[in-house]
Amino acid sequence: IHHANHLRPNRDGLKVGGHQASCASLATVMSALYFSVLRPEDRVAVKPHASPVFHAIQYLFGHQTQEKLERFRALGGAQSYPSRTKDVDDVDFSTGSVGLGVAMTLFSSLV
């Protein structure tokens, strides 16, 4: 990661880092959900470390801006964990604390 961010030529300005395995493990599931299965009334708690996949899908739907994606994890950029208050895209549950998503979704299903 250090080499990718500091030593390689970086013509596009993209940063490398984060939790690639979490994103890779959820990309197919998120794609199937958002492009085939979900209805407008359905809610999703995104695995916190997979927020880049969520933000990318939201960008494809027009709910996220390219500028926010380019500033991912930086001041004014898309958040590293989905946030209902800090993100411009359509976040159903803020899931910054790992494990909190499960409790929030269970509670919301009861209310």
Predicted regions span which residues?
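Cofactor-binding active-site loop characterized by glycine-rich and histidine/acidic residues
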Residues: H2-L14, Q20-V111
